[in-house]
Amino acid sequence: MSRKYFGTDGIRGRANGLITPELAMKVGQAAGLVFQRGEYRHRVVIGKDTRLSGYMIEYALVAGFTSVGMDVLLLGPMPTPAVAMLTKSMRADLGVMISASHNLFEDNGIKMFGPRGFKLSDAVEKQIEQLLDENLDKKLAQSTGLGRARRIDGVHDRYIEFAKRTLPRELSLDGLRVVVDCANGAAYRVVPEALWELGADVVPISVEPDGFNINKECGSTAPEALCRKVREMRADIGIALDGDADRVIIVDERGHVVDGDQLLAVIAESWKEDGRLTKPGIVATVMSNLGLERFLEGQELSLVRTPVGDRYVLEQMLKQGYNLGGEQSGHIILSDYATTGDGFVSALQVLAVVQKLGRPVSEVCHKFEPLPQILKNYRYRSGKPLDRAEVKSAITAGEKRLNGHGRLLVRSSGTEPVIRVMGEGDDRILVEDVVDTIVSALGGPAAA
């Protein structure tokens, strides 16, 4: 469908640009109207990350929801997967997370979960979008039917206990020194505490949010500081989350990064051995490395590919009955435990494998040699660059050059005005030349 407000992961944009108090209040009203069914009191849970604009958006959403008669339960800073879990646990009609995930503080967003903790379907988002463009004044609640709002205490402990229960009761992290980078984001309290309770020697970094430093030179999209800290502290493992903790990457004891593809391989192999895979395969996106696919073939496991976006991964998992899926970026979905990507719970599954095998992370987590993969971004101001004839011609020529030797993927980002050009294959020089040719046709140079 054509989307005016919703992208691949909710509504996202510059705070006080696209994401204004007026829009947030309207989203609260529209979503509240869509999710009010029956005569009982309806309620929504709202969590957020640590961006400065979170306060503004939170209060605007509260105004919107209460104005249509919904009660609001405010969770404060909490990981996105915790909000999804608590939506279901607290029997809410709707869950809302205020976050722009891995983006810097200037951006913010609104993503929503239904009563079972799953992200909203395209059809429901379309209903909300239609209401956003209507005058809703006549649909507001009467003065006696307005909603109430209150803050909920103790929610951090609920998530910590949930995360711990995903591990066997007898498993301890005793003897492991773990450096955890919380990206100055939503997980800054809960994840270090949970690791400590599991027995790890915890070294937390990027756990001092100030409203401006979320994802700034830290977290899963900027792991350099974590790599240095792991080497400095002679730690066994590093864990890097993003601002809302729905994605994770690992750093081994040598300071080398382990991406989402490798983590999927680790968990898939372990779960196959333990008989925990519901089907002989996993789900990943078109961005996952061909090396992962070849590794899985060696394990007699299949790889189902989807468009980019964890919502599409989950959609196929539910449709085809898989219980493991994810993205190269570190969104890992473990449907036995969660309804969305959970960076911390995914990290715990990897830690469980490390403890079970008693071997260094560098031996456990590098399962395959990734094929050379080149990804370049082209940022544009307006128009539809992919519709231009010279761009289409360059893409067609590139596909012919890589035919049988690799893959080419050119797509528009679902969250920002960027064209992503990805090529991979056995010949790095060939792949890079193909990608550079397409970026030049787009109008290069590539954005950082």
Swiss-Prot record:
Keywords: Isomerase, Magnesium, Metal-binding, Phosphoprotein. SUPFAM superfamilies: Phosphoglucomutase, C-terminal domain, Phosphoglucomutase, first 3 domains. The keyword ATP-binding does not apply. The keyword Metal-binding applies. Mg(2+) binds at residues 101, 242, 244, 246. This is Phosphoglucosamine mutase. The modification Phosphoserine is found at residue 101. One of its GO terms (biological process) is peptidoglycan biosynthetic process. One of its GO terms (cellular component) is cytosol. It comes from the Bacteria. Belongs to the phosphohexose mutase family. The gene is glmM. PANTHER family: PHOSPHOGLUCOMUTASE (ALPHA-D-GLUCOSE-1,6-BISPHOSPHATE-DEPENDENT), PHOSPHOHEXOSE MUTASE. GO terms for molecular function: magnesium ion binding; phosphoglucosamine mutase activity; phosphomannomutase activity. It catalyses: alpha-D-glucosamine 1-phosphate = D-glucosamine 6-phosphate. Transmembrane segments: none annotated. It is an enzyme of class 5 (isomerase). Gene3D superfamilies: Alpha-D-Glucose-1,6-Bisphosphate, subunit A, domain 3 (3.40.120.10), Alpha-D-phosphohexomutase, C-terminal domain (3.30.310.50). Its EC number is 5.4.2.10. It comes from Nitrobacter hamburgensis (strain DSM 10229 / NCIMB 13809 / X14).
